[in-house]
Amino acid sequence: MRAVVQRVLEASVTVEGQRVSDIGPGLLVLLGVGKGDTEADVAWMVEKLATLRIFEDAAGKMNLSLEETSRQLIVVSQFTLYGDARKGRRPSFIDAMEPVSAKALYERTCELLRQRGLSVGTGIFAADMKVALVNDGPVTLLLESPGPAAPKG
């Protein structure tokens, strides 16, 4: 499971001209599910997203997490995080999980984040979405669960 995590001042997701999610300060998470990802990858990602200390404390140090700040997040499904463009000119997506199973793990991730008391907005799985954001920092991190879909070596 892969995620691009961006600290934002605000973010929104629009589908077919309708705004489906918006947040103030928090995180925008682009989440990709890879072949072989399991509930263990979901649990790892949820723990990391909830407790990652990337918000500033009173001293200006990145020392606070989503859970500690009560900030919001939007989680957007993004199979293209498994695009491989090393050969040719068109990316291959063969490492992305097939849509039915990927949707289940994506939804489970959002559900477990909510169970931790976090305010979670979402996009619409497999929809053509317009994602708008104002980066804060900018702070952008790449996360990858240690499961079988992670690169070897």
Swiss-Prot record:
Pfam families: Tyr_Deacylase. CDD domains: Dtyr_deacylase. Its main location: cytoplasm. The keyword Ribonucleoprotein does not apply. One of its GO terms (cellular component) is cytoplasm. A motif (Gly-cisPro motif, important for rejection of L-amino acids) lies at residues 137-138. Keywords: Cytoplasm, Hydrolase, RNA-binding, tRNA-binding. GO terms for molecular function: D-tyrosyl-tRNA(Tyr) deacylase activity; Gly-tRNA(Ala) deacylase activity; Ser(Gly)-tRNA(Ala) hydrolase activity; tRNA binding. It catalyses: glycyl-tRNA(Ala) + H2O = tRNA(Ala) + glycine + H(+); a D-aminoacyl-tRNA + H2O = a tRNA + a D-alpha-amino acid + H(+). Its EC number is 3.1.1.96. It is found in: Cytoplasm. One of its GO terms (biological process) is D-amino acid catabolic process. The keyword Cytoplasm applies. A Gly-cisPro motif from one monomer fits into the active site of the other monomer to allow specific chiral rejection of L-amino acids. Belongs to the DTD family. An aminoacyl-tRNA editing enzyme that deacylates mischarged D-aminoacyl-tRNAs. Also deacylates mischarged glycyl-tRNA(Ala), protecting cells against glycine mischarging by AlaRS. Acts via tRNA-based rather than protein-based catalysis; rejects L-amino acids rather than detecting D-amino acids in the active site. By recycling D-aminoacyl-tRNA to D-amino acids and free tRNA molecules, this enzyme counteracts the toxicity associated with the formation of D-aminoacyl-tRNA entities in vivo and helps enforce protein L-homochirality. Homodimer. This is D-aminoacyl-tRNA deacylase.
